[in-house]
Amino acid sequence: MSCRAAPWSRPSVPRARSFPASARLRNPFGGMNVWKNPILKSSWRIGDVPMIFGLPSGLFKCMASSSSGDGGFSRPQSTDEAPMPLYSWPDKQRPRVCILGGGFGGLYTALRLESLEWPGNNKPQVLLVDQSDRFVFKPMLYELLSGEVDVWEIAPYFTELLKKTSVQFIKDSVKLLRPSDHLRREPAGSCTGGVVHLESGTVIEYDWLVLALGAEAKIDAVPGSAEYALPFTTLEHALKVESELTMLERSRFGKSSPAIQVAIVGLGYSGVELAATISERLKNTGTVKAINFQTTVCPSAPPGNRDAALKVLESQNIELFLGYSVSCIREVYAPDDPGSMVTDAEEAGSDDKKLLLELQPAQRGLQSQVLEADLVLWTVGSTSQILRLQPPDAPYVIPLNGRGQVETEETLQVKGHPRTFAIGDSAALRDTAGKFLPANAQVAFQQADFAGWNIWAAINDRPLLPFRFQNLGEMMTLGRNDAAITASFIEGLTLDGPIGHAARKVVYCLRMPTDEHRVKVGMSWFAKSAVDSLAALQNAVSNMIASS
């Protein structure tokens, strides 16, 4: 079985063998059984200091875990601190896998683990932790602004997606990571991968950890950007932008109202998709201004996608400011007299608020400019969450690169941490040419397959597979009935226009997390398409009758 092919097909399960009793042993926690992997020798001491959960044992005096098997919480007792709730795994013997982050990497890893066949009693308990209660199909957030999709279609609840699986879900934010799989262990000790501290105070002890937390928008890049610009990376961001656009449209309703002005910073994929979608939505009621540091749009995109994007942006009369960077965003108030700008809200109504973007040339031959906007969207820059999750009072034990991403082996294991995997935007992994893999859904989707398989292999003492990214092409939406798709396996082929739009929706429908949700979304989209086609036919017939 080749390394490239294995994750894409259902793996052949190695011949089942009984798990040796010596691999299960009792630890100091009320006689609770934990998992022991032969490749990691156990220890509960660092030097002369006994350790529990990767911390000095004096901090904890744990009660026996609940035996009810309900996946609830039991509380450890501490002699000198307030008790912390300890997550109680339903089964005290099977391995415990904790997945942090419920995006493409985290959710699909959980579903991959659920789909594999496990010999004996080796099937792990899987716990998924995310700060939101919804999975978000981020490549289709733009369709929320155009009205093509409903929230439930691209942001289903985790509980709905996982209801037919054994995967448990907790809505919470990660506060601290304390891995212990890098420590030297003694044969007589117990073995655990470490613990995770959540913002609620809950402590999760695990045997295997998957870091799939993704990245956050870096919105504080220049003065005023954090206060006045909106990012577009989450469902909450998309709903906020939709709300702002709706309020602007309502307030400017009428022929004499000034045009709505939207400024978009950054013209990578996200910026271009936003510009095309919003410009099509506003039509003659507004203008879109797009700023980019480079002198072209989508600089990392294939030529076919880049040409299609530029064609649409120009056809929609989007104002492009290429070769500029934003140095500052500030708020002013513009009364009815356009020649008088004031900075005091008391001198002008709040409805007259305007935002000014100061642009500095990034290329020679350009002059500084000041743009006016009602709404500013920020699509450049991101930051990793891992750096702030490591203990501030201890040396960093998770290796990070200069961008705050986790350094991993080819097997997606964190370097020096054989029981910890990192995937998606959290991980720094290079392709065979030495270039960093792009931070997109396609990479995370493929890594989830490998991560799930490699956890299966590690638990069952099988060789782990090195991750190999297979670039299947790139897609982007360019409006309600327009998109561009470049397939990597057919050189020079780009599908755009309505054909590209239809192909993109079919591909994304097939990529939905579960079969049940896939069917629901497919039926919903088909019904909407039928209604749109009927409306278009009626308009065409009406126009023919009117012109005859």
Residue ranges and their predicted role:
Residues 55, 71-78, 83, 447-548:
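C-terminal, flexible cofactor-proximal segment of oxidoreductases
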Residues 85-170, 225, 263-264, 273-304:
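Beta1-alpha1 glycine-rich phosphate/pyrophosphate-binding loop at the start
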Residues 242-286:
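Rossmann-like NAD(P)H-binding beta-loop-alpha module
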Residues 1-43:
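N-terminal chloroplast transit peptides
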Residues 164-196, 280-410, 416, 463-464:
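A Rossmann-like FAD-binding core segment of flavoenzymes
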Residues 39, 50, 54-61, 65-94, ...:
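FAD-binding core/adjacent interface of flavoenzyme oxidoreductases
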Residues 141-149, 226-230, 304-305, 393-395, ...:
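Short glycine-enriched, charge-decorated loop/helix-capping segments at active-site entrances
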Residues 81, 227-253, 370-446:
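FAD-site-proximal beta/loop scaffold in flavoenzymes
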